[in-house]
A protein has these predicted regions:
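NTP-dependent nucleotidyl-transfer catalytic core
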Residues: 1-194
Length: 194
């Protein structure tokens, strides 16, 4: 598998995503041309804070459209016009949506927002002449506990250890806190450090 692009599904692609998309697609095509079996994969980062913030942005756009409430000026929200389009689509499909409680409609908002956003991304990829064989959802991996299973497999093979990492090089480290974490033993595979 070659996983490439994998832009967060919180809006349309930008030039930076396109660069990675082109590089990944060319690499995959070169490998295929040389007789390798390749699966082109897109990892959908649809789990975590960014998705919560994205759904919340749509929530506030819905309130703006339906009740003329001002969209909040918060750094964690997505202010783009595409969020307005998503909100309008949701209102078309769910005209009686209850906007009194974000938590109650989070699942609907996140699913509809992700679907809309992934359609934009797939259209952009198609315009670049690219297609992926697999689209893998992070959320589905988490819900199926595949990450925990992988970690257990690594532990059984003694490929991981608990330990501490040094602060990142070349960065201000005033906020760095040494915390115990699971570390992959990459030195077993001739890397310089774990």
């Amino acid at each position: 598998n070659i996983e490439f692009v994998s832009a967060n599904p919180t809006g349309p692609m930008h030039v930076g995503h396109s660069r990675g998309a082109i590089f990944g697609d060319v690499l995959a095509n070169l490998l295929i041309f040389n007789g390798n079996q390749v699966t082109k994969e897109y990892y959908i980062n649809d789990y975590g804070n960014q998705i919560i913030n994205f759904a919340e942005s749509v929530f506030y756009r819905l309130k703006e459209i339906k009740y003329k409430e001002k969209f909040p000026n918060r750094v964690n929200l997505y202010p783009g016009d595409y969020v307005i389009d998503i909100a309008k689509n949701i209102l078309t499909g769910h005209p009686k949506i209850d906007l009194n409680n974000f938590q109650k409609i989070f699942k609907l908002l996140s699913e509809e927002s992700l679907k809309h956003s992934m359609n934009l991304i797939k259209a952009d990829l198609k315009a670049l002449g690219m297609s992926h064989d697999n689209f893998v959802s992070e959320k589905s991996l988490v819900e199926k506990k595949l990450v925990e299973t992988a970690i257990e497999n690594l532990k059984e093979k003694n490929f991981v250890t608990e330990g501490y990492l040094n602060p990142p090089k070349g960065e201000e480290n005033k906020d760095w806190k040494k915390t115990k974490r699971l570390i992959f033993k990459s030195t077993l595979f001739e890397d310089d450090t774990d």
